[in-house]
């Protein structure tokens, strides 16, 4: 018999049950809280005090009055005395809530454990969340700002525990008979991912998983969506729910696993019968030799640009990528691409010059940039925009960004994040051109012969590779996710949140250095001023470029929001608590698609009025209202007497509702790296080009100097990815 069983979240059933019990008891039921423009339960989150002691990711809270003291009429007698436990997945792993109910029917003790949560964020929030459970006498707690996922996990786990205390545990699912693994049929489970609901539908026969369908269209494009695309095949291959999470997409992966487990339990499975992930025996690795014209290490923006252009030029190309998907740090780019004298600027009446682009970049980099590299990037930028047009990736929306004199940063028409947009387009071209991409394969060494690069050594889970090539292009990104390297060059950044993708660990820099490459500006590491600390999510510079402002915890502006990133970061760190709020309105939200991801992720706070917003973020309402009134007048006058802001003032902030995101600086870009010349050739410690070795993107140094201007990273990867490709093609033809 074919079963159709959809597992919905237990919460819905629990609320219905509590309502029924309360009605029978004659109790008054309050209307449930409604989410407004963000994840449920985050609208009025409490902020953890900066002076609060660090948590060991475990906390117990109990009321001051003796246990079993009387509780309010709203909760008295609702729950049965005893101790009850529930669990749910947080940001890093399982979170467990244990609640003790006294004889009077109220919660008398709350204990939360979550050893996998980020210590300074989710872990720090746990004591506050435990106290909130006691104060609320329910699972409907406000949560902690910046610890969205941990807060939601506590709500879900507490809901489970209180369900048990209410005597409303779910009916035990049927079990497969005999030595069968499943009851044949099709089953669906649901869970909450990074951007919304994730559904997993499985079709099973008595002893096998026959089909897996995953739906998670709201997950982050080219990060979570890769987990949605790839984990179904891995689950089918393993014939088990216990497969490794996709690196870099842990939240989405965990949501898929929760939904899958629900579906399999409904199918009669005993989950303890499946081996844990990674328990399969490892055999001896095989050895394989490959040959190609050009081998490219890294499938981020620079690597994919180089691969597409080299293939278009008639060369055979292999890309080696250590992650299970393409994109690298390019996926994280949310702003746009700087380019001067483009046809889009001309069509929109924007006056800009290559020379001004160069000067802005040099000034932003504190004049330690290599001017020759900057000049080439600026001169090539319009041509790069034309090439993006030709491959189906136009960037027609032109606006301001920090450090730019003119409207120069080019973005997708709908204002969506440029990185995910370009990665999707690059990937489509890679597939259409049939370029070989070796996923989950890590390059370990550059092979040389008589001083020239002649290929690479690499390895995957089960194979060692020798890849012979006429030319090698390094496009592995920087080292923003290698804390050891970060701390080595900048000890004061230890423990700082990073926006970098998981694979950005400096591999290419180390490989190049091993064959004699020189390094430049290696200690220049950039902080981005607008990073949501709980999720490491970067708030695109376009939000400020389109008119948003920054305020401190007093509700006051404190800087020109569109100064260079290092200047704005320094200004934030000087504020009480070393954080700020970015404030914007509905009109700005409507014009910038990237904001929808912030809303769906639950990191925004929304208020119907400025005063309402101020109360929710614990800022003085009168002060914030005065700040907005002044700012709107400055926009009308096109003059900012407080901080001399002259750009991003086309739109005021007067359209309700209003939004805020709590932000602080985070590691964003490593400006230093392998030294290259204007042909993207890698330079050795003696100042000579290493034959056959080229590099592009964040793996290189010299372009950005002491600070990278917003929009220049994408310009760098497309321009120098193109130049590296052209130079490698020419080298192959010698």
Language-model-detected regions and their locations in the chain:
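Core beta-strand elements of the Rossmann-like FAD/NAD(P) dinucleotide-binding domain
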Residues: 289-292, 460-471, 689
